[in-house]
Amino acid sequence: LTNALVGQKVAIMSARPQTTRHTIRGIVHRPDAQLVLVDTPGLHRPRTLLGERLNELVKGTLTEVDVVGFCLPSDQKVGPGDRFIAEQLADAARDGRGTPVVAIATKADLVGKARLAEHLLAISQLGDWADIVPVSAETGYQVDVLEKILISHLPEGPALYPEGELTDEPVAVMVAELVREAALEGVRDELPHSLAVVVDEMVPRTGEDGATPMLDVRVQLFVERDSQKAIIIGKGGSRLRDVGTTARKEIEALLGTRIFLDLHVKVAKDWQRDPKQLGKMGF
């Protein structure tokens, strides 16, 4: 949804919940407004130190924004996780500035009108929302409506970013996220949460013709167990090659230059619970 609002890919996409690891800013420029979207990890009941730190990140973000968008997929029933988030948002509203919350029924294109109506009713009963809006990032349905609603809750003030800037994400972070997105494609349930990606270096050089600019990108993929390492690498390295091919195309499109992508998979046992490992990985 962030990508649909910005009009360009600034955040990775995965069908797995709880795979966002840091806040991602996407910037929407309009003649009369500038919308800075802060895409955060989802609030959840943490089971690891990483989960606790991500929750702290989200709660800190909630104190800094002017309006909150709470996404509830239309193809899933409102469940305990949604109720937990609704309670956390209500607590934040009581303790803070009373920041308005817009409930967003995402993936509206995946359900019929009757199912969507049921979902919107369930959302309305979940909390006291400033607005409720169904959207589809895939088809663009009501993305413009959501944009106008979010802008309506913004205070007047100067633009925070220059025209044309779509994100303030460091390039290395975006590269790492694109590799992680490719690695998450089609993996089993437990692996997404155990995978971390770190860019070691990005070194410019010229290609073999001596003229074409290139970039050598060295990336490490960390997992928690040897069995997970085997999944990422695949038989004879086939899966890791596929990950590299997919990620390389995305990274070249992002950077506008050819790259040589060097991927290495390492085991960092229980890194999600290890403060030192978390620090090394930027958490």
What are these regions (language model features)?
Residues 17-19, 41-44, 74-78, 108-111, ...:
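Conserved nucleotide-binding/hydrolysis micro-motifs of P-loop NTPases
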Residues 18-21, 51, 55-58, 62, ...:
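Amphipathic alpha-helical transducer elements in NTP-driven molecular machines
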Residues 99-102, 109-171:
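Canonical P-loop GTPase G-domain recognition
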Residues 171-283:
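P-loop NTP-binding site
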Residues 8, 27-31, 61-68, 92, ...:
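Conserved, well-folded catalytic cores of nucleic-acid-processing
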Residues 1-15:
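A conserved segment at the C-terminal end of the G1
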Residues 26-38, 52-132, 186, 203-214:
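Conserved C-terminal guanine-recognition region of P-loop GTPase G domains, centered on the G4
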